[in-house]
């Protein structure tokens, strides 16, 4: 909790000084702390969608000084960038929806090379309506190369979300993830619902449970 508080203070100071996406980065602090606590990056691969929500990821991967030292604020990019951190930033991701397809590609390559590591795609609800996101979910659900998709369903996007997908996300929220109508299960995924994504303990417990799920060889 102290780390999350310090990170939020740094994000507010950073964005109030030079601008940037303050909301997404304040909202995913505990989620990304949990990801880096449970998974062993850079051995495990973390793909952040859009990546303007990646400040916490960068702070936890050796770049905190760029958010703490005002003289270095302009030396850090806003998006994940392999030129900036080839170990931790696998892809340059500056637009919406590709994370699931990219993670699926990593999973397929891992299988072909017979390697052993975890893969996590972190995507917001607003990005799920993108065609590339559906393509990734659809193909991965069928081909059984296990990886983890974290959906940050904060009901926030650059524009209001519309469509049947968001009706189902709302139904899942209203039923604490128990609705018999489940978009993700219909595509072949095991599903874990976390009611409070800013509760670090809940996030960590869900991520640890996800590792048990993906140990089953035929489930994404």
PLM feature segments, named:
Residues 54-57, 128-130, 155-159, 166, ...:
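Flexible loop/turn segments at secondary-structure boundaries
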């Amino acid at each position: 909790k102290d780390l999350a508080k310090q990170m939020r203070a740094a994000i507010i100071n950073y964005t109030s000084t030079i601008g940037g996406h303050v909301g997404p980065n304040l909202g995913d602090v505990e989620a990304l702390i949990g990801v880096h606590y449970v998974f062993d990056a850079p051995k495990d691969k973390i793909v952040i969608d859009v990546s303007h929500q990646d400040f916490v990821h960068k702070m936890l991967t050796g770049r905190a000084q760029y958010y703490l030292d005002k003289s270095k604020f302009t030396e850090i990019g806003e998006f994940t960038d392999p030129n900036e951190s080839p170990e931790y930033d696998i892809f340059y991701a500056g637009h919406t929806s590709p994370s699931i397809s990219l993670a699926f590609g990593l999973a397929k390559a891992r299988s072909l090379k017979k390697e052993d590591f975890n893969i996590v795609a972190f995507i917001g609800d607003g990005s799920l309506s993108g065609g590339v996101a559906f393509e990734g979910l659809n193909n991965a659900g069928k081909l059984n190369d296990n990886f983890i998709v974290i959906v940050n369903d904060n009901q926030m996007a650059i524009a209001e979300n519309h469509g049947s997908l968001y009706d189902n996300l709302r139904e899942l929220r209203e039923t604490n993830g128990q609705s018999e109508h489940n978009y993700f299960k219909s595509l072949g995924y095991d599903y874990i619902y976390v009611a409070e994504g800013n509760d670090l303990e809940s996030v960590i417990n869900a991520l640890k449970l996800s590792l048990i799920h993906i140990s089953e060889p035929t489930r994404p």
